[in-house]
Amino acid sequence: MKRTLLLCTAIAALFAACTTQQKKAWAHLDQDTLYVVASQFKAGAEMAALGDSANVIHYVLKERAEVPFSQSAIRQSTDEAKQGPVADEPFFTVRFTLPIPASYTPTEQGEMAGLDYGVFHHCHSPGFEVMPNGDALAIYFSSPRGRSESDTMATFVQARLRFGAEEWDMPELFFDTKLGNDQSGLLWNDNGKIWFFGGGRYMSNYVPFRIATSEDNGATWTYSIPQLDTAATDFTAQPINSAFRDPAGNIYMAMDADDSNSFLWRSSDEGKTWVDMGGRTLGRHSTIIPLDEEGTLLSIGGKNASLEGWTPQNISRDWGATWEEATPSPFPPLGSAQRPSIIRLQSGNLVYITDSYMLKKDIPAPEGWKNEDKCVIAISKDNGQTWRIKSLPVALPHNRRTAHPSLGYSTVRQAPNGLIHILTSANYPALHYELNEAWIWSDEGEVTISKEGGEVKAYSEKYPNGQLKAEWEAKTYPNGRYLLHGTTTDYYADGTVQHKVVYQDGRKTGEELFYNPDGTLRWRWERNLETMRGVWTQYYPNGQKRVESHWNIEPTPRDLNRKFIGYVAEGPATHWNEDGTQKAVYEFVKGEVVEN
């Protein structure tokens, strides 16, 4: 009876909150069931919420036919993840995160090159986190060219950088809400438990985001719908990049409000029910960090707001229930396709990343800014009272506004080994940085990282039942860095081979094989580290070739004359029917189709 009364009250509140414009935008969501296509997801306790038509929307998981490689062959050991470069020597490296295609090609060309369905040209607003096992995981929303970010065709896609590897795995579908919008992700490592908060426009004022949690480094996930007592108001269904707990165990998660503001959600029951904290910052995409255990928070940015020519910052003394009047920060303001990020490091220092130039409105940094138009990283020993600000020596511009470098919708995180990771978006393509505090405090630019010497050691991991799960080799270099080096073999629980590859100083070389659980070959890579070329062949279950594509594995991007570790399609991509007859051939040059 209590639940019925609650539903009735909530429905009445929902109708009161709905504007004509919102009802029109939600017209496609008059059904009672939304199917969520994913792999190795299980339903949580809460899988329904009120809809806009006085109905209850049920979210139903639909299993994919195949488990993505991003959720396969994932080690659970955390010991190796603590190995890293010595802390007192500057360390800096940068690589591609995403391949071309799909990144910002003139038409949708990802599937032509063999990428998973749902990986479209626009991969943006990512959640990013370093897993307990040291892997880096990025979850972007992805929307097709010619469709808006709030379109129902938008998906969430995932990409993984395995600990000790130098190159990211190919992006694959994370989940796809059929007839619903997937937009803007946030990943948070909650002391070993990984939380994903995914936005999505126009589902319901009672569904401002969705939740997925993992306790095995992102191999499997539990999906759930947040429970709200009243309809959300003054919000945009876009999580940002900040989440944290208070000393009492309450969870806070940052989200965009309407217009140029941001706010915090709070859950006091491990993510089941949520309330809007009430306060609003002066800035869309604000990045937020606790300054103490008493409720003092610092919010900086993020876009579409400035104060005396600088990006605004706010202080809250009550966990975001209210915010003091904004003051100018020491950083330039941001605009469209730009977002800052802040975290507290293991050392206790704060680190903050941002751009210097407002791209869309073509506004340079205010007078007194000393870092020109560069992307910057800043570090503070005194809770943000003063900052050391340093330019990143390598950066790419926005994919269309190419005059100035940009981190796009940036996220910064720290790995168990102390390295600082930065993920960008909206570049051609997105980049991933690894660096340490010693580099920030130093005057070094790019650093030459030696791969000479080192000791190779064999490792293994077992399933809980004692069955061998993985065996691999890795090298620890004189500076402490750990990279995969030698043969890696992963096994299914029944003992059959799942995946096999050879690494050379963190780079995959020669043949790489990935098998289905029934023993059939799903795909094969052949890489040559002398020519820096690779061939990716995918197979039907009957053993016939499905797609074979050719790749440059040390490409030079369009906007910077510098080689990166990454993937750009170069040469033919041939498609076959299941009976072996040829279906299509696409010729790629520098990641784009020139002939088919």
Per-segment meaning from a language model:
Residues 4-13:
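Sec-dependent N-terminal signal peptides
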Residues 8-9, 23-24, 42, 160, ...:
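Compositionally biased, intrinsically disordered low-complexity segments enriched
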Residues 16-17:
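C-terminal motif of bacterial Sec signal peptides marking the signal peptidase cleavage site
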Residues 20, 26-456, 531-532:
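Asp-box/BNR beta-propeller blade signature and adjacent active/binding-site loops
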Residues 20-21, 54, 483, 568:
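A compositionally biased, intrinsically disordered/low-complexity signal enriched
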Residues 447-596:
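Glycine/tyrosine- and acidic-biased, solvent-exposed loop/turn segments at the edges of beta-strands
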